[in-house]
Amino acid sequence: MANPVVAIVGRPNVGKSTIFNRIVGERISIVEDVPGVTRDRIYSSAEWLNHSFYLIDTGGIDIGDEPLLVQIRQQAEIAIDEADVIIFMTNGRDGVTAADEEVAKLLRRSNKPVVLAVNKIDNPEMRDLIYDFYALGFGEPYPISGAHGTGLGDLLDAVARHFPKDHGQEYEEDVIKFCLIGRPNVGKSSLVNAILGEERVIVSDIAGTTRDAVDTSFVREGQKYVIIDTAGMRKRGKIYESTEKYSVLRALRAIERSDVVLVVLNAEEGIIEQDKKIAGYAHEAGRGVILVVNKWDAVEKDDKTMVEFERKIRDHFPFLDYAPILFVSAKTKQRLHKLLPLVQLVSDNHAMRVQTNVLNEVIMDAVAMNPTPTHNGRRLKIYYMTQVAVKPPTFVAFVNDPELMHFSYERFLENRIRDAFGFEGTPIKIIARPRK
Protein backbone atom coordinates (compact mmCIF):
# COMPACT_ATOMS: atom_id res chain seq x y z
CA MET A 1 0.00 0.00 0.00
CA ALA A 2 1.28 3.47 -0.85
CA ASN A 3 1.78 5.87 2.02
CA PRO A 4 -0.36 9.01 1.94
CA VAL A 5 1.22 12.30 0.92
CA VAL A 6 1.04 15.49 2.97
CA ALA A 7 2.06 18.79 1.37
CA ILE A 8 3.01 21.95 3.23
CA VAL A 9 1.73 24.87 1.14
CA GLY A 10 1.91 28.59 1.70
CA ARG A 11 3.39 31.84 0.53
CA PRO A 12 7.12 32.45 1.07
CA ASN A 13 8.47 33.25 4.52
CA VAL A 14 5.79 31.58 6.60
CA GLY A 15 8.18 28.89 7.91
CA LYS A 16 7.35 25.91 5.69
CA SER A 17 10.86 24.49 5.69
CA THR A 18 11.24 24.91 9.45
CA ILE A 19 8.04 22.97 10.11
CA PHE A 20 9.09 20.37 7.52
CA ASN A 21 12.35 19.80 9.38
CA ARG A 22 10.55 19.69 12.73
CA ILE A 23 8.21 16.96 11.49
CA VAL A 24 10.76 14.77 9.72
CA GLY A 25 13.52 15.28 12.28
CA GLU A 26 16.49 13.03 11.49
CA ARG A 27 14.67 11.23 8.70
CA ILE A 28 15.87 13.63 6.03
CA SER A 29 19.39 12.20 6.15
CA ILE A 30 20.42 9.32 3.92
CA VAL A 31 20.42 6.11 5.93
CA GLU A 32 23.22 4.39 4.05
CA ASP A 33 26.22 6.05 2.49
CA VAL A 34 25.97 4.94 -1.12
CA PRO A 35 28.39 6.47 -3.65
CA GLY A 36 26.58 8.41 -6.33
CA VAL A 37 23.25 8.55 -4.50
CA THR A 38 21.92 11.91 -3.37
CA ARG A 39 18.56 12.71 -1.89
CA ASP A 40 16.54 15.73 -2.85
CA ARG A 41 15.44 17.43 0.34
CA ILE A 42 12.13 18.57 -1.09
CA TYR A 43 10.38 15.53 0.39
CA SER A 44 10.91 12.97 3.12
CA SER A 45 9.21 10.04 4.77
CA ALA A 46 7.75 10.82 8.18
CA GLU A 47 5.75 9.15 10.94
CA TRP A 48 3.18 10.30 13.45
CA LEU A 49 1.95 7.78 15.99
CA ASN A 50 1.23 4.70 13.84
CA HIS A 51 0.92 6.60 10.56
CA SER A 52 3.67 6.62 7.92
CA PHE A 53 3.45 9.28 5.22
CA TYR A 54 5.44 11.34 2.74
CA LEU A 55 5.88 15.02 3.48
CA ILE A 56 6.45 17.59 0.70
CA ASP A 57 8.08 20.93 1.42
CA THR A 58 6.94 23.31 -1.31
CA GLY A 59 9.36 25.81 0.18
CA GLY A 60 12.07 23.66 -1.33
CA ILE A 61 11.33 25.00 -4.80
CA ASP A 62 13.76 27.67 -5.92
CA ILE A 63 11.96 30.97 -6.39
CA GLY A 64 14.08 31.90 -9.42
CA ASP A 65 13.03 34.86 -11.57
CA GLU A 66 9.33 34.11 -11.72
CA PRO A 67 6.81 36.61 -10.35
CA LEU A 68 5.86 35.82 -6.78
CA LEU A 69 2.20 35.00 -7.34
CA VAL A 70 3.03 32.73 -10.27
CA GLN A 71 5.43 30.85 -8.03
CA ILE A 72 2.86 30.59 -5.24
CA ARG A 73 0.30 29.28 -7.69
CA GLN A 74 2.76 26.67 -8.99
CA GLN A 75 3.55 25.49 -5.49
CA ALA A 76 -0.10 25.13 -4.60
CA GLU A 77 -1.06 23.41 -7.86
CA ILE A 78 1.70 20.86 -7.52
CA ALA A 79 0.69 20.08 -3.96
CA ILE A 80 -2.97 19.87 -4.91
CA ASP A 81 -2.11 17.37 -7.62
CA GLU A 82 0.06 15.10 -5.48
CA ALA A 83 -1.21 15.39 -1.93
CA ASP A 84 -3.83 13.46 0.00
CA VAL A 85 -3.84 16.13 2.72
CA ILE A 86 -2.58 19.72 2.59
CA ILE A 87 -1.16 21.75 5.47
CA PHE A 88 -1.90 25.39 4.61
CA MET A 89 0.85 27.33 6.38
CA THR A 90 0.41 30.99 7.36
CA ASN A 91 2.30 33.46 9.55
CA GLY A 92 0.40 34.67 12.61
CA ARG A 93 2.55 37.77 13.01
CA ASP A 94 1.65 39.04 9.54
CA GLY A 95 -2.06 38.32 9.73
CA VAL A 96 -4.00 37.29 6.61
CA THR A 97 -2.27 38.67 3.50
CA ALA A 98 -3.35 38.94 -0.13
CA ALA A 99 -0.94 36.12 -0.95
CA ASP A 100 -2.58 33.90 1.69
CA GLU A 101 -5.94 34.57 0.07
CA GLU A 102 -4.51 33.64 -3.34
CA VAL A 103 -3.38 30.27 -2.00
CA ALA A 104 -6.73 29.78 -0.26
CA LYS A 105 -8.62 30.25 -3.55
CA LEU A 106 -6.64 27.46 -5.18
CA LEU A 107 -7.03 25.14 -2.22
CA ARG A 108 -10.78 25.69 -2.00
CA ARG A 109 -11.16 24.51 -5.60
CA SER A 110 -9.11 21.38 -4.95
CA ASN A 111 -11.63 19.40 -2.90
CA LYS A 112 -8.63 18.07 -0.97
CA PRO A 113 -8.60 18.07 2.85
CA VAL A 114 -6.87 21.21 4.11
CA VAL A 115 -5.57 21.74 7.65
CA LEU A 116 -4.83 25.39 8.43
CA ALA A 117 -1.67 26.07 10.46
CA VAL A 118 -0.78 29.48 11.89
CA ASN A 119 2.97 29.58 12.50
CA LYS A 120 5.10 31.81 14.71
CA ILE A 121 2.70 31.67 17.65
CA ASP A 122 5.69 31.48 19.95
CA ASN A 123 3.98 32.12 23.29
CA PRO A 124 0.46 31.88 24.77
CA GLU A 125 -0.03 35.65 24.63
CA MET A 126 0.09 35.48 20.81
CA ARG A 127 -2.71 32.94 20.55
CA ASP A 128 -5.35 35.59 19.87
CA LEU A 129 -3.64 36.23 16.51
CA ILE A 130 -5.13 33.03 15.09
CA TYR A 131 -8.73 34.23 15.02
CA ASP A 132 -8.34 36.38 11.90
CA PHE A 133 -7.47 33.20 9.99
CA TYR A 134 -10.97 31.76 10.36
CA ALA A 135 -11.79 34.16 7.50
CA LEU A 136 -9.85 31.91 5.09
CA GLY A 137 -12.64 29.35 5.34
CA PHE A 138 -10.76 26.22 6.40
CA GLY A 139 -12.20 25.81 9.86
CA GLU A 140 -10.13 25.77 13.02
CA PRO A 141 -6.64 27.29 12.67
CA TYR A 142 -3.95 25.34 14.54
CA PRO A 143 -1.42 27.58 16.33
CA ILE A 144 2.14 26.28 16.04
CA SER A 145 5.67 27.48 16.62
CA GLY A 146 8.42 26.35 14.29
CA ALA A 147 10.95 27.96 16.60
CA HIS A 148 9.85 25.97 19.67
CA GLY A 149 8.06 22.98 18.12
CA THR A 150 4.86 23.63 20.05
CA GLY A 151 1.46 22.75 18.61
CA LEU A 152 2.76 20.18 16.13
CA GLY A 153 1.07 17.25 17.88
CA ASP A 154 -2.40 18.74 17.54
CA LEU A 155 -1.66 19.71 13.93
CA LEU A 156 -0.51 16.21 12.97
CA ASP A 157 -3.48 14.64 14.76
CA ALA A 158 -5.73 16.75 12.54
CA VAL A 159 -3.77 15.78 9.44
CA ALA A 160 -3.89 12.05 10.26
CA ARG A 161 -7.67 12.13 10.60
CA HIS A 162 -7.83 12.81 6.86
CA PHE A 163 -5.59 9.91 5.81
CA PRO A 164 -7.32 7.46 3.45
CA LYS A 165 -8.43 4.28 5.17
CA ASP A 166 -7.28 2.25 2.15
CA HIS A 167 -4.01 3.41 0.66
CA GLY A 168 -4.12 1.26 -2.44
CA GLN A 169 -4.97 -1.91 -4.27
CA GLU A 170 -3.73 -5.20 -2.82
CA TYR A 171 -2.62 -7.90 -5.25
CA GLU A 172 -2.22 -11.66 -4.99
CA GLU A 173 1.16 -13.06 -4.05
CA ASP A 174 1.81 -14.51 -7.51
CA VAL A 175 1.44 -11.14 -9.26
CA ILE A 176 4.69 -9.42 -10.25
CA LYS A 177 4.39 -5.67 -9.75
CA PHE A 178 6.79 -3.42 -11.63
CA CYS A 179 7.08 0.23 -12.58
CA LEU A 180 9.06 2.37 -15.00
CA ILE A 181 10.82 5.45 -13.68
CA GLY A 182 13.06 7.98 -15.36
CA ARG A 183 13.36 11.64 -16.19
CA PRO A 184 11.06 13.23 -18.79
CA ASN A 185 11.46 12.21 -22.43
CA VAL A 186 13.29 8.93 -21.87
CA GLY A 187 10.33 7.09 -23.38
CA LYS A 188 8.55 5.60 -20.36
CA SER A 189 5.09 6.01 -21.88
CA SER A 190 6.21 4.52 -25.19
CA LEU A 191 7.68 1.52 -23.39
CA VAL A 192 4.48 0.97 -21.41
CA ASN A 193 2.44 1.13 -24.60
CA ALA A 194 4.86 -1.18 -26.41
CA ILE A 195 4.70 -3.75 -23.61
CA LEU A 196 0.91 -3.66 -23.47
CA GLY A 197 0.55 -3.52 -27.23
CA GLU A 198 1.99 -7.00 -27.50
CA GLU A 199 -0.50 -8.41 -25.04
CA ARG A 200 -3.48 -10.48 -26.17
CA VAL A 201 -5.10 -10.46 -22.73
CA ILE A 202 -5.37 -7.17 -20.87
CA VAL A 203 -7.26 -8.10 -17.74
CA SER A 204 -8.25 -4.73 -16.34
CA ASP A 205 -7.32 -1.19 -15.42
CA ILE A 206 -7.48 -0.94 -11.65
CA ALA A 207 -7.43 2.29 -9.70
CA GLY A 208 -4.28 1.78 -7.69
CA THR A 209 -4.36 4.62 -5.19
CA THR A 210 -6.71 7.15 -3.75
CA ARG A 211 -6.16 9.51 -6.68
CA ASP A 212 -5.56 9.16 -10.39
CA ALA A 213 -2.85 6.51 -10.62
CA VAL A 214 -3.93 3.54 -12.70
CA ASP A 215 -2.36 0.09 -12.44
CA THR A 216 -2.56 -1.99 -15.60
CA SER A 217 -2.86 -5.76 -15.13
CA PHE A 218 -2.06 -8.28 -17.84
CA VAL A 219 -0.95 -11.87 -18.33
CA ARG A 220 2.02 -13.14 -20.34
CA GLU A 221 2.67 -16.87 -20.76
CA GLY A 222 0.67 -17.66 -17.62
CA GLN A 223 2.44 -15.09 -15.42
CA LYS A 224 0.37 -12.24 -13.99
CA TYR A 225 1.93 -8.77 -14.09
CA VAL A 226 0.89 -5.30 -12.98
CA ILE A 227 2.48 -2.13 -14.28
CA ILE A 228 2.17 0.29 -11.38
CA ASP A 229 0.86 3.81 -12.04
CA THR A 230 0.61 3.83 -15.82
CA ALA A 231 -1.53 6.96 -15.53
CA GLY A 232 1.41 8.70 -13.92
CA MET A 233 3.62 7.68 -16.83
CA ARG A 234 1.23 9.08 -19.38
CA LYS A 235 0.42 12.29 -17.59
CA ARG A 236 2.39 15.33 -18.63
CA GLY A 237 1.44 18.72 -17.27
CA LYS A 238 3.07 22.10 -17.65
CA ILE A 239 3.59 22.26 -13.92
CA TYR A 240 5.55 19.01 -13.91
CA GLU A 241 7.65 20.07 -16.88
CA SER A 242 8.65 23.29 -15.13
CA THR A 243 9.28 21.70 -11.72
CA GLU A 244 10.59 18.22 -12.36
CA LYS A 245 11.47 17.74 -8.72
CA TYR A 246 7.87 16.91 -8.02
CA SER A 247 7.65 14.06 -10.49
CA VAL A 248 10.03 12.36 -8.05
CA LEU A 249 7.18 11.94 -5.61
CA ARG A 250 5.04 10.05 -8.09
CA ALA A 251 8.04 7.83 -8.86
CA LEU A 252 8.57 7.19 -5.15
CA ARG A 253 5.01 6.05 -4.68
CA ALA A 254 5.27 3.73 -7.66
CA ILE A 255 8.58 2.31 -6.38
CA GLU A 256 7.05 1.72 -2.96
CA ARG A 257 4.32 -0.47 -4.46
CA SER A 258 6.57 -2.39 -6.89
CA ASP A 259 8.67 -5.54 -6.68
CA VAL A 260 10.87 -4.57 -9.63
CA VAL A 261 11.79 -1.10 -10.89
CA LEU A 262 12.78 -0.42 -14.49
CA VAL A 263 15.07 2.63 -14.55
CA VAL A 264 14.71 3.99 -18.08
CA LEU A 265 17.62 5.84 -19.71
CA ASN A 266 17.71 7.72 -23.01
CA ALA A 267 20.37 6.30 -25.34
CA GLU A 268 20.39 9.47 -27.46
CA GLU A 269 21.05 11.85 -24.56
CA GLY A 270 23.34 9.66 -22.48
CA ILE A 271 23.48 9.73 -18.68
CA ILE A 272 23.04 12.85 -16.57
CA GLU A 273 22.99 13.57 -12.83
CA GLN A 274 19.20 13.36 -12.65
CA ASP A 275 19.35 9.75 -13.90
CA LYS A 276 21.61 8.88 -10.97
CA LYS A 277 19.23 10.48 -8.47
CA ILE A 278 16.24 8.63 -9.88
CA ALA A 279 18.07 5.30 -9.87
CA GLY A 280 19.15 5.96 -6.30
CA TYR A 281 15.52 6.04 -5.16
CA ALA A 282 14.98 2.46 -6.39
CA HIS A 283 18.21 1.25 -4.78
CA GLU A 284 17.46 2.90 -1.44
CA ALA A 285 13.98 1.35 -1.44
CA GLY A 286 15.53 -2.12 -1.72
CA ARG A 287 13.63 -3.06 -4.87
CA GLY A 288 14.78 -5.24 -7.73
CA VAL A 289 16.28 -3.02 -10.45
CA ILE A 290 16.73 -3.31 -14.22
CA LEU A 291 18.48 -0.57 -16.20
CA VAL A 292 16.63 -0.15 -19.51
CA VAL A 293 18.37 1.88 -22.21
CA ASN A 294 15.60 3.05 -24.54
CA LYS A 295 15.86 4.60 -28.04
CA TRP A 296 18.78 2.32 -28.90
CA ASP A 297 17.61 2.32 -32.52
CA ALA A 298 18.43 6.04 -32.79
CA VAL A 299 22.11 5.64 -31.88
CA GLU A 300 24.80 5.32 -34.54
CA LYS A 301 26.84 2.33 -33.49
CA ASP A 302 29.57 -0.11 -34.30
CA ASP A 303 30.57 -3.37 -32.64
CA LYS A 304 31.98 -1.50 -29.60
CA THR A 305 29.13 0.94 -28.93
CA MET A 306 27.10 -1.26 -26.61
CA VAL A 307 30.12 -2.33 -24.57
CA GLU A 308 31.24 1.29 -24.19
CA PHE A 309 27.76 2.46 -23.18
CA GLU A 310 27.52 -0.35 -20.65
CA ARG A 311 30.87 0.68 -19.17
CA LYS A 312 29.61 4.27 -18.84
CA ILE A 313 26.52 3.01 -17.04
CA ARG A 314 28.62 0.99 -14.59
CA ASP A 315 30.83 4.04 -13.98
CA HIS A 316 27.83 6.30 -13.32
CA PHE A 317 25.85 3.77 -11.25
CA PRO A 318 28.42 1.96 -9.05
CA PHE A 319 25.69 1.32 -6.46
CA LEU A 320 23.69 -0.65 -9.07
CA ASP A 321 26.40 -3.08 -10.11
CA TYR A 322 23.92 -5.92 -9.47
CA ALA A 323 21.35 -4.55 -11.96
CA PRO A 324 21.15 -6.10 -15.45
CA ILE A 325 21.24 -3.73 -18.43
CA LEU A 326 18.92 -4.14 -21.41
CA PHE A 327 19.21 -2.07 -24.60
CA VAL A 328 15.79 -1.69 -26.23
CA SER A 329 13.70 0.39 -28.59
CA ALA A 330 10.04 1.03 -27.86
CA LYS A 331 9.73 2.31 -31.42
CA THR A 332 11.11 -0.73 -33.27
CA LYS A 333 10.39 -3.28 -30.48
CA GLN A 334 14.10 -4.21 -30.47
CA ARG A 335 14.80 -6.68 -27.60
CA LEU A 336 11.42 -5.97 -25.98
CA HIS A 337 10.75 -9.72 -25.97
CA LYS A 338 13.54 -10.01 -23.36
CA LEU A 339 12.04 -7.47 -20.98
CA LEU A 340 9.30 -9.42 -19.17
CA PRO A 341 11.39 -12.60 -18.76
CA LEU A 342 14.06 -10.39 -17.16
CA VAL A 343 11.44 -8.78 -14.90
CA GLN A 344 10.35 -12.26 -13.80
CA LEU A 345 13.95 -13.37 -13.16
CA VAL A 346 14.69 -10.30 -11.04
CA SER A 347 11.40 -10.70 -9.15
CA ASP A 348 12.27 -14.33 -8.38
CA ASN A 349 15.75 -13.32 -7.18
CA HIS A 350 14.29 -10.53 -5.06
CA ALA A 351 12.19 -13.13 -3.21
CA MET A 352 14.84 -15.91 -3.15
CA ARG A 353 15.71 -17.76 0.06
CA VAL A 354 18.82 -19.84 0.60
CA GLN A 355 19.25 -22.66 3.11
CA THR A 356 21.27 -21.76 6.18
CA ASN A 357 23.60 -24.77 5.93
CA VAL A 358 24.40 -24.08 2.27
CA LEU A 359 24.87 -20.37 3.00
CA ASN A 360 27.34 -21.09 5.78
CA GLU A 361 29.39 -23.40 3.58
CA VAL A 362 29.78 -20.46 1.20
CA ILE A 363 30.69 -18.07 4.04
CA MET A 364 33.25 -20.44 5.58
CA ASP A 365 34.86 -20.98 2.17
CA ALA A 366 34.97 -17.20 1.71
CA VAL A 367 36.66 -16.70 5.08
CA ALA A 368 39.19 -19.42 4.28
CA MET A 369 39.99 -17.68 0.98
CA ASN A 370 40.15 -14.18 2.48
CA PRO A 371 40.60 -14.11 6.28
CA THR A 372 38.51 -11.70 8.32
CA PRO A 373 39.98 -8.26 9.12
CA THR A 374 41.61 -7.21 12.38
CA HIS A 375 41.46 -3.91 14.24
CA ASN A 376 43.70 -2.97 17.18
CA GLY A 377 44.83 -6.57 17.45
CA ARG A 378 41.30 -8.01 17.47
CA ARG A 379 40.11 -10.21 14.61
CA LEU A 380 36.53 -10.39 13.38
CA LYS A 381 35.00 -13.81 14.01
CA ILE A 382 31.95 -14.89 12.00
CA TYR A 383 30.15 -17.66 13.87
CA TYR A 384 27.38 -18.20 11.36
CA MET A 385 25.05 -16.38 8.97
CA THR A 386 21.34 -16.80 8.26
CA GLN A 387 18.84 -15.22 5.91
CA VAL A 388 16.16 -13.34 7.85
CA ALA A 389 14.12 -11.67 5.08
CA VAL A 390 13.40 -11.39 1.38
CA LYS A 391 12.43 -8.44 -0.83
CA PRO A 392 15.31 -7.63 -0.57
CA PRO A 393 17.30 -10.68 0.58
CA THR A 394 18.62 -9.79 4.03
CA PHE A 395 21.26 -11.74 5.92
CA VAL A 396 22.39 -11.51 9.54
CA ALA A 397 25.98 -12.45 10.36
CA PHE A 398 26.47 -13.34 14.03
CA VAL A 399 29.94 -12.15 15.01
CA ASN A 400 32.10 -11.44 18.05
CA ASP A 401 31.97 -7.64 17.51
CA PRO A 402 29.94 -5.89 14.77
CA GLU A 403 32.36 -2.94 14.88
CA LEU A 404 35.03 -5.20 13.38
CA MET A 405 32.94 -5.81 10.23
CA HIS A 406 34.54 -3.34 7.82
CA PHE A 407 32.36 -2.30 4.88
CA SER A 408 34.94 -3.65 2.42
CA TYR A 409 34.76 -7.12 3.98
CA GLU A 410 30.98 -6.94 4.03
CA ARG A 411 31.15 -6.18 0.31
CA PHE A 412 33.47 -9.16 -0.19
CA LEU A 413 30.94 -11.45 1.52
CA GLU A 414 28.14 -10.02 -0.60
CA ASN A 415 30.11 -10.80 -3.76
CA ARG A 416 30.72 -14.38 -2.61
CA ILE A 417 26.98 -14.80 -1.91
CA ARG A 418 26.19 -13.47 -5.37
CA ASP A 419 28.74 -15.80 -6.97
CA ALA A 420 27.13 -18.76 -5.24
CA PHE A 421 23.42 -17.98 -5.57
CA GLY A 422 23.02 -15.37 -8.31
CA PHE A 423 20.69 -12.68 -6.97
CA GLU A 424 20.96 -10.76 -10.25
CA GLY A 425 18.94 -7.57 -10.17
CA THR A 426 18.36 -7.38 -6.43
CA PRO A 427 20.23 -5.58 -3.66
CA ILE A 428 21.46 -7.66 -0.74
CA LYS A 429 21.63 -6.49 2.86
CA ILE A 430 24.11 -7.92 5.35
CA ILE A 431 23.71 -7.00 9.02
CA ALA A 432 26.37 -7.84 11.62
CA ARG A 433 25.04 -8.71 15.08
CA PRO A 434 26.83 -9.86 18.24
CA ARG A 435 26.27 -13.49 19.19
CA LYS A 436 24.34 -13.65 22.42
From Swiss-Prot:
Binding site for GTP 1: 10-17, 57-61, 119-122
Family: Belongs to the TRAFAC class TrmE-Era-EngA-EngB-Septin-like GTPase superfamily. EngA (Der) GTPase family.
Natural source organism: Geobacillus thermodenitrificans (strain NG80-2)
CDD domains according to UniProt: EngA1 (cd01894), EngA2 (cd01895)
GO biological-process terms attached to the record: ribosome biogenesis
Domain EngA-type G: residue ranges: 4-167, 176-351
PANTHER family: GTPASE DER (PTHR43834:SF6)
Protein name, per record: GTPase Der
Pfam families: KH_dom-like (PF14714), MMR_HSR1 (PF01926)
Segments forming domain KH-like: 352-436
UniProt keyword terms in alphabetical order: GTP-binding, Nucleotide-binding, Repeat, Ribosome biogenesis
Gene name of the encoded protein: der
Self-association state and partner proteins as the record states: Associates with the 50S ribosomal subunit.
Residues annotated to bind GTP 2: 182-189, 229-233, 294-297
